[in-house]
Amino acid sequence: MLLISGLLLTQGCLSTTPEPSVIGDLIIAEPIAISYKNEIALARLTQVLQRAEISDGQRAELFYQRGVEYDKVGLRALARFDFNQAINLKPDMSDAYNFLGIHFTQLREFNQAYDAFDSAIELAPDHEYAYLNRGIALYYGGRPNLAADDFKVFRQYQQNDPYRLLWQYLADVELDQKKANQDLVVYALQVGDRVWAKNVIKLYLGEMSQGTFIDRMAEDVNSNEALAERLCEAYFYLGKYSQLQGDANAAINFFKLALSTNVYEFVEHRYAKLELDLMRETALESREP
């Protein structure tokens, strides 16, 4: 891993002069590269789809699997094509609807995202991640009250998962900051102290400084892949934390750092780009006369 200090906030360059919005040394992982396993999986699935005589149901499953592989390496348009093909062949494929909803959210096509997630939940009422993903779509679509309801359902499936608590908090804080903080204190009691992501909760509650949080980001990580995954999460939630603190410049850089990991399939990577797009739009609108 590489340590850098003094991240230049507005230009994304390195500087020997520390900036006040960034505390301490930042950890950078080598971006995750496309593995040969992904390439082989894509080649094999394509070969079977082109040559094999199979049923529509089997073909739908193969399109779905290839869509997932495309999604893992960031080829979103190809993934969407395959998910649509899967649904055309097998209209009751809830997982394909769930993925399409995620992609529509990333494209900010929120009404289409809601429809896709509604279909996923109608087909599979216990599809817990469809509730998470619909909640995220509602959150970015400016409906935090409905998002909070979906995050609550998602949280009930595993109440000691810190990430479920964090998304609940991000919606709740839009509605009532004081109550959101009080609720997070209670929810956090169910999360073990040895779970790394509890540090994010402590940061949000003011129980840990940003500097200490950054110092602990690489704790108990023994490979570059694990480090990249950890940093993808950490920098995304630092970005959201910076937003809550009113530090837009720091938030922008943290979201860029989350993107730099190339962990395409993580929720945090997916929405770091959306966060940047939204912040750029806000900045442009504020400059207009």
Where are these regions (language model features)?
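Helix-turn-helix repeat elements of alpha-solenoid scaffolds
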Residues: 32-46, 74-77, 106, 140-145, ...
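N-terminal leader/linker segments that initiate helical-solenoid repeat arrays
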Residues: 13-61, 65, 280, 284-289
